[in-house]
């Protein structure tokens, strides 16, 4: 079919959106390169999978797949509210936190409005901005992370929404409690601030600012989190936002009916009751991060210190060629930018010890080959 058939009918701000490119699936790499062993370190997934309790809960509910889910996720909201020490009316659930990030843009911004986000930020922020016809204000990064002072200075009377991520994806950088408090105090009360904490469980920094602690003081703050990462429920697509009741009520007006499937609800409920699994996940991540960063240092490779479950390593102008060579070795990692200095980095998700070893052996082989000396 011709691509131009309906081009004139599509809204201009929609036709300009670049399609989000996820990490390559294992099956695609196996098919393309005829490989049996694959280590997927591209999508920041939990290498341990899901909690055994969550798996068991899902298995016990498979018989009910013919029924619609609870449209309000009543029991999950109750459990999540208890876990977070919030009220159920202060929580909105989404089909992945991506859905909620997009909904917030649809609720608060439109043509003529401005949405602020950082350079080197999660692609969904800019996509959501374009989708509602708003103007994206991308503030240059500082040391690969958010320049909060510059972001505060970028606020105008057209600003409706600000997206922040702490830790940031894809760079893994973190801003401190002091930096956060200085920033949020400068934001006008009519500007919505979305604080994306998808990787909060992995943080080890002593000066991390937990967004939940600021919700009462700042009614314009929305905290976004997910079950996809530390809880290992990426396949089931479930995330949540926490904010004051009024903001949550607007999100619930716009979210699709039955947006959280039944299996996701029961899995998330069970996952909340397995804190030891999350601890095991975080401990494994800490160990894996130490292993990879030590390897990079031994090889003389620069990397961005990360507070997530991934790390970006600088492989120079040949990074995309190295990425292709890694694929041929059965290792899937993630290029992070099409151009500029950041395009010389690859993002590596922390895997199981044997997956990390697979990556390091493959990269070492590539870097010592005649093609890359």
From Swiss-Prot:
The organism's superkingdom is given as Bacteria
Q: Which CDD domains match?
A: AAT_like
Write down the Gene3D superfamilies for this protein, in alphabetical order. Answer: Aspartate Aminotransferase, domain 1, Type I PLP-dependent aspartate aminotransferase-like (Major domain)
The family database entries (PROSITE patterns) matched by this protein are listed as: AA_TRANSFER_CLASS_2
PANTHER family reported for this sequence = HISTIDINOL-PHOSPHATE AMINOTRANSFERASE (PTHR43643:SF3), HISTIDINOL-PHOSPHATE AMINOTRANSFERASE 2 (PTHR43643)
What stretches pass through the bilayer? none
This enzyme catalyses: L-histidinol phosphate + 2-oxoglutarate = 3-(imidazol-4-yl)-2-oxopropyl phosphate + L-glutamate
| Name of protein | Histidinol-phosphate aminotransferase 2
Q: Recorded GO terms, molecular function?
A: histidinol-phosphate transaminase activity; pyridoxal phosphate binding
Transferase keyword on record: yes
Q: Name its pathway.
A: Amino-acid biosynthesis; L-histidine biosynthesis; L-histidine from 5-phospho-alpha-D-ribose 1-diphosphate: step 7/9
GO BP annotations of the record are: L-histidine biosynthetic process
Q: Which NCBIfam families does this chain map to? A: hisC
Subunit-level organization: Homodimer.
Name the EC number(s).
Answer: 2.6.1.9
Residue numbers of N6-(pyridoxal phosphate)lysine PTMs: 229
**Cited InterPro entries:** Aminotrans_II_pyridoxalP_BS (IPR001917), Aminotransferase_I/II_large (IPR004839), HisP_aminotrans (IPR005861), HistidinolP_aminotransfase (IPR050106), PyrdxlP-dep_Trfase (IPR015424), PyrdxlP-dep_Trfase_major (IPR015421), PyrdxlP-dep_Trfase_small (IPR015422)
Which keywords fit this entry according to its UniProt record? Amino-acid biosynthesis, Aminotransferase, Histidine biosynthesis, Pyridoxal phosphate, Transferase
Identify the cofactor(s).
Answer: pyridoxal 5'-phosphate
Give the family, as the similarity comment puts it: Belongs to the class-II pyridoxal-phosphate-dependent aminotransferase family. Histidinol-phosphate aminotransferase subfamily.
Keyword NADP (UniProt): no
């Amino acid at each position: 079919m011709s691509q131009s058939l309906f081009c004139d009918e599509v809204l201009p701000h929609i036709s300009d959106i670049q399609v989000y490119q996820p990490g390559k699936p294992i099956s695609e790499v196996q098919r393309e390169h005829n490989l049996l062993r694959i280590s997927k370190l591209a999508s920041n997934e939990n290498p341990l999978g899901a909690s055994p309790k969550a798996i068991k809960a899902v298995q016990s509910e498979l018989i009910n797949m013919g029924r619609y889910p609870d449209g309000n996720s009543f029991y999950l909201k109750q459990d999540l509210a208890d876990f977070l020490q919030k009220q159920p009316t202060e929580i909105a659930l989404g089909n992945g936190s991506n859905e909620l990030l997009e909904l917030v843009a649809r609720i608060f911004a439109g043509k003529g409005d401005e949405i602020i986000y950082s350079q080197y930020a999660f692609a969904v922020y800019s996509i959501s901005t374009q989708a509602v016809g708003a103007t994206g204000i991308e503030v240059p990064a500082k040391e690969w992370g958010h320049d909060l002072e510059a972001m505060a200075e970028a606020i105008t009377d057209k600003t409706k929404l600000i997206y922040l991520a702490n830790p940031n994806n894809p760079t893994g950088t973190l801003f401190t409690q002091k930096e956060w408090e200085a920033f949020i105090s400068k934001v006008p009360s009519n500007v919505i601030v979305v604080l994306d904490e998808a990787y909060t469980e992995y943080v080890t920094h002593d000066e991390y600012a937990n967004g939940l602690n600021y919700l009462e003081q700042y009614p314009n703050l929305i905290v976004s989190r997910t079950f996809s990462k530390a809880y290992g429920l990426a396949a089931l697509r479930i995330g949540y936002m926490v904010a004051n009741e009024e903001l949550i009520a607007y999100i619930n007006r716009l979210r699709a009916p039955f947006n959280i499937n039944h299996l996701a609800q029961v899995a998330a409920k069970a996952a909340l009751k397995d804190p030891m699994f999350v601890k095991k996940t975080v401990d494994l991540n800490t160990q894996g991060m130490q292993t990879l960063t030590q390897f990079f240092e031994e090889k003389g490779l620069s990397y961005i210190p990360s507070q997530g479950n991934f790390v970006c390593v600088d492989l120079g102008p040949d990074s995309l060629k190295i990425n292709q060579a890694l694929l041929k070795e059965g290792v899937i990692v993630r290029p992070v930018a099409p151009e500029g200095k950041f395009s010389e980095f690859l993002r590596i998700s922390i895997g199981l010890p044997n997956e990390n070893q697979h990556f390091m052996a493959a990269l070492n082989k590539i870097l010592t080959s005649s093609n890359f000396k």
